[in-house]
């Protein structure tokens, strides 16, 4: 009995254990534990691909169509145009994102880029085999190639892909210069001129997909073979089937898909891999769709139909057609389902019934009826409507209305009476002036710039050449530490901001603008200062400082960071290589920047330079500079669009780059090659430019205008004539580096200051002392400053303590290497000409200044009657006297003049003799010790002394000497001749 009880107990215990074990194995608790383990294993084994989200967003933002035309008479001109446009569009997107294109099956036009050329068709035999290494700097670009490559292997590389491909939304139809049909899920594509291809279509109609990749490399392949032979692969497959998780497995690459419409049935597809994992770790097919080919065929016993559903703006549309037939029909999916339901419910179905139900023509209804008779299940693939290509935005101009009763805040002060009876004016701080600032400096220039802009395909190519020329090797740049930036920002306000924001990393990108406090020759739209968040500026400065020292200061045309002496040397060096020099003046430069210049040139340069480790951060910082919300000090909101934010770390260098690019592009438009155009850029400092005269004025202006800028040619100076750069006049840069500060602009404002805090006498001493450093030998300026200091109490000043002093004395290196000067009597002629006087009148006044002793308030003033034309209607107010108020004149095209230089520039072009030839300057025609009253101005002066005749400058046709323009034209002609010569 006891034995029986023991056996019973043992059997009961075993049964209990079995039942308990079974319940545990099938319990939700164990399932949760297994799933949790699986998730942890996946988290440990998956790999996130770097910068995927940023790359995808950048591609979406930068996708902008570039139109490329082909020659007339091309056998399939429209198709080739769209194809070439797509290729240039994709290349442009890649380079604007800071990456380099890797082109699979490039055409001869793309031979300069890295890529792979293999043989997929007969046309490929025109080129040689090549296979460059793919790096993490590349984005793969394909044009009508994805049909022939293993997309699973390509996506598995983990490199972003841009491809132009055929994505039909119907089962047959017309395409540009041809038509297509579908048989056995293969598209048969026929184009005029003989192109006839068959291939399958990849299904990109999911936003997130995956691919499986086979092992790559010798050892990985060998390991896989050994696992297959030993049965490990089969065992892992069994475990995966039973448990949903197993060792090993193929690599799975997950990626996002975006599509952009190029034309009918034609899309640009963006593929950005973002993670990898192993297939045996999860039931991957339950997570999403695997990249596969499109399936159009609907098999049945009667006839093989093709079907595809297209999601349009009006709703889903289904396309039906017999395999291989050109005839097809497309109708709303809902209508087709209703027709099919009616067909199935009706006992007798005739073609006439389908015609009536579908409300289609007999021809289209016949296709629908045939499909219904075949009894197709119609499990059609779905094709999604792609996104449209990005477009430019148009800025809306703000209107402003000056309130006569408004009393603006005055800030400018005089520390002495003006050297001239005419003085500069200052805009008061008021709401009406802020509205005028937005209209005249931002919204208006942006609207006019967009109306002028005309970007051609060649300009995209030239922009890429310029970027690569400035940054030959990509990905070498790294930012400086933020501590480096703080050490170089030594102004009191900068130090205070650094201290306050040192522990704050996050910020909201809002532009806070204010009206700049500065003097104008005549009433003008006040300049706008757009400040950006401190963190944005400091972080971006860490890149701009590094880029400036690594790249910019080593190129010959870049003048910032150079001392005045070095700049003067550069002007003289440029003159030595030129027979003519051209001065350029941009109007409202900051307000006329458009997206092409910012993204295709400026941003592309920084992105190409920076290392991939920092590309994401830099791209974000650069993106913040465009279309940021902005508000003025008095609360007026506005849209800066793509204009330059003047308080940004990019301002000086970005403006210099843009200025240089305009000069470079003009050279390319004139027929120069890359190196030649680069050599003839000239010199630039922000919006100030000076270049050789080998490009015509019309071409320079037209080139700038096509980019949106408003460029005026101020002076085309032949050898021996005065030239102005950075508001300094060089009497003859071909023979001397000496220069003087622009007399008119300086003398109108010399006696004023915008400093509202410092002692007025301290400011006066500091300002005059600063001008005596840079222009002690300049007639009138030097005389006036010495007269002021002679008649007031001497002071010891530190230039760093004052803001309203010349820029060129704020740096000790600049002071030690100041502008070269000379005591030539010819400078009297220059100053007199600038002020509209005779030399005798000027010398008389200078003698009065030298002899004056008395209170500063009694300093002699020179009477002038210059035409200082207002640029806007104003109510004159403030302590500083202003010019008259009048309506702005209009140009020939009816637009208001927009130049910032209010005073007329006198005789910046060469004088002419009776035959209309350019004449040399005074010094070569004058006897020693004699002065010429007519220095640069050909107009009649108040002096009764008649002008002396001058020998003409020999033109190209009258001597053996050729101008720079002749050399360029000759070089271009020789180049064309070489191209025409047989090899």
Swiss-Prot record:
Pfam families: Noda_Vmethyltr, RdRP_1
Keywords of this entry: Nucleotide-binding, Nucleotidyltransferase, RNA-directed RNA polymerase, Transferase, Viral RNA replication
Catalytic activity: RNA(n) + a ribonucleoside 5'-triphosphate = RNA(n+1) + diphosphate
UniProt name for this protein: RNA-directed RNA polymerase
MF terms (GO), sorted A to Z: nucleotide binding; RNA binding; RNA-directed RNA polymerase activity
InterPro entries in the record: DNA/RNA_pol_sf (IPR043502), Noda_Vmethyltr_dom (IPR043647), RNA-dir_pol_C (IPR001205), RNA-dir_pol_PSvirus (IPR007094)
This protein's record includes keyword Translocase: no
Annotated source species: Striped jack nervous necrosis virus (SjNNV)
All copies of domain RdRp catalytic, residue ranges: 579-701
Family: Belongs to the nodaviridae RNA polymerase family.
Region of interest called Disordered, as start-end residue ranges on this chain: 879-983
Gene Ontology annotations of biological process type: DNA-templated transcription; viral RNA genome replication
Ranges of compositional bias, category Low complexity: 943-960
């Amino acid at each position: 009995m006891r034995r029986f009880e023991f056996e019973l107990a043992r059997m009961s215990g075993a049964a209990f254990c079995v039942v308990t074990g079974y319940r545990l194995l099938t319990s939700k608790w164990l399932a949760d534990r297994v799933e949790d383990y699986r998730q942890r294993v996946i988290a440990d084994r998956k790999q996130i691909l770097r910068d995927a989200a940023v790359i995808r967003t950048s591609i979406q933002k930068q996708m902008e169509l570039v139109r490329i035309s082909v020659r007339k008479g091309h056998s399939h001109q429209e198709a080739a145009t769209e194809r070439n446009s797509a290729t240039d569009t994709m290349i442009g997107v890649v380079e604007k994102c800071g990456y380099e294109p890797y082109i699979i099956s490039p055409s001869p036009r793309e031979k300069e880029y890295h890529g792979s050329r293999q043989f997929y068709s007969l046309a490929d035999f025109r080129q040689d085999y090549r296979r460059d290494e793919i790096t993490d700097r590349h984005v793969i670009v394909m044009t009508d190639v994805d049909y022939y490559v293993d997309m699973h292997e390509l996506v598995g590389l983990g490199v972003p892909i841009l491809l132009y491909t055929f994505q039909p939304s119907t089962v047959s139809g017309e395409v540009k210069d041809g038509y297509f049909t579908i048989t056995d899920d293969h598209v048969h594509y026929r184009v005029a001129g003989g192109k006839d291809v068959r291939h399958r279509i990849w299904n990109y109609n999911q936003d997130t997909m995956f691919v499986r990749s086979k092992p790559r490399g010798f050892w990985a392949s060998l390991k896989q073979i050994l696992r297959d032979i030993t049965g490990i692969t089969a065992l892992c497959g069994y475990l995966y089937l039973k448990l949903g998780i197993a060792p090993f497995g193929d690599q799975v690459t997950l990626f996002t898909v975006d599509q952009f419409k190029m034309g009918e049935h034609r899309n640009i597809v963006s593929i950005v891999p973002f993670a990898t994992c192993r297939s045996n770790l999860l039931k991957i097919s339950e997570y999403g769709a695997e990249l596969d080919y499109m399936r159009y065929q609907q098999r049945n016993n009667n006839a093989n139909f093709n079907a595809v559903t297209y999601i349009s703006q009006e709703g889903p549309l289904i396309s039906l057609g017999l395999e291989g037939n050109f005839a097809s029909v497309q109708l709303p999916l809902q209508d087709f389902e209703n027709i099919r339901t009616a067909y199935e419910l009706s006992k007798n179905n005739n073609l006439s019934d389908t015609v009536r139900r579908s409300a289609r023509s007999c021809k289209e209804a016949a296709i629908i009826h045939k499909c219904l008779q075949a009894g197709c299940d119609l499990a059609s693939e779905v094709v999604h409507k792609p996104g449209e290509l990005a477009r430019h935005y148009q800025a809306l101009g703000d209107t402003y209305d000056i309130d006569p009763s408004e009393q603006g805040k005055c800030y400018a002060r005089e520390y002495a009476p003006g050297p001239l009876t005419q003085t500069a004016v200052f805009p008061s701080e008021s709401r009406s002036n802020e509205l005028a600032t937005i209209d005249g400096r931002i919204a208006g220039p942006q609207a006019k710039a967009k109306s002028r802009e005309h970007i051609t395909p060649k300009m995209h190519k030239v922009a890429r050449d310029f970027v690569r020329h400035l940054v030959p090797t990509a990905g070498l740049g790294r930012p400086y530490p933020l501590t480096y930036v703080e050490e170089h920002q030594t102004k009191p306000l900068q130090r205070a901001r650094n201290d306050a924001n040192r522990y704050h990393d996050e910020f909201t990108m809002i532009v806070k603008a204010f009206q700049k406090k500065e003097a104008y020759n005549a009433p003008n739209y006040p300049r706008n200062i757009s400040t950006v968040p401190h963190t944005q500026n400091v972080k971006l400065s860490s890149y701009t400082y590094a880029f400036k020292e690594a790249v910019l200061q080593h190129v010959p045309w870049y003048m910032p960071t150079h001392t005045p002496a070095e700049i003067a040397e550069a002007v003289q060096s440029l003159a030595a290589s030129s027979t003519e020099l051209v001065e350029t003046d941009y109007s409202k430069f900051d307000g006329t920047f458009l997206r092409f210049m910012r993204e295709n040139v400026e941003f592309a340069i920084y992105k190409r330079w920076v290392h991939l480790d920092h590309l994401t951060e830099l791209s974000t910082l650069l993106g913040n500079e465009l279309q940021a919300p902005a508000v003025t000090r008095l609360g007026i909101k506005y849209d800066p669009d793509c204009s330059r934010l003047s308080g940004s770390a990019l301002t000086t260098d970005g403006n210099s780059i843009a200025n240089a690019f305009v000069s470079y592009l003009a050279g390319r438009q004139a027929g120069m090659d890359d190196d030649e155009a680069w050599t003839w850029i000239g010199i630039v400092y922000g919006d100030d430019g000076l270049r050789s005269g080998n490009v015509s004025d019309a071409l320079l202006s037209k080139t700038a205008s096509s980019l949106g800028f408003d460029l005026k040619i101020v002076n085309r100076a032949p050898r021996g004539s005065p030239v102005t750069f950075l508001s300094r006049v060089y009497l003859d840069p071909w023979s001397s580096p000496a220069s003087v500060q622009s007399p008119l602009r300086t003398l109108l404002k010399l006696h004023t200051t915008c400093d509202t805090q410092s002692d007025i006498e301290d400011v006066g001493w500091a300002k005059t002392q600063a001008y005596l450093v840079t222009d002690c030998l300049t007639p009138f300026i030097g005389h006036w400053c010495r007269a002021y200091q002679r008649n007031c109490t001497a002071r010891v000043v530190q230039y760093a303590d004052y803001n309203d002093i010349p820029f060129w004395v704020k740096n000790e290196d600049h002071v030690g290497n100041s502008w070269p000067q000379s005591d030539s009597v010819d400078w009297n002629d220059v100053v007199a000409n600038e002020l509209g006087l005779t030399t005798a009148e000027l010398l008389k006044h200078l003698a009065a200044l030298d002899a004056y002793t008395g209170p500063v308030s009694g300093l002699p003033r020179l009477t002038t009657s210059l035409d200082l034309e207002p640029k806007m209607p104003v109510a004159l107010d403030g302590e500083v006297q202003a010019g008259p108020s009048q309506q702005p004149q209009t140009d020939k095209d009816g637009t208001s003049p927009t130049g910032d230089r209010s005073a007329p520039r006198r005789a910046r072009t060469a004088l002419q003799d009776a035959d209309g030839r350019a004449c040399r300057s005074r010094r070569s025609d004058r006897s020693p010790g004699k002065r010429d009253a007519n220095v640069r101005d050909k107009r009649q002066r108040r002096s009764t002394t008649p002008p002396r005749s001058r020998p003409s400058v020999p033109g190209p046709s009258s001597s053996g000497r050729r101008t720079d323009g002749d050399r360029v034209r000759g070089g271009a002609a020789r180049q064309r001749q070489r191209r025409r010569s047989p090899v």
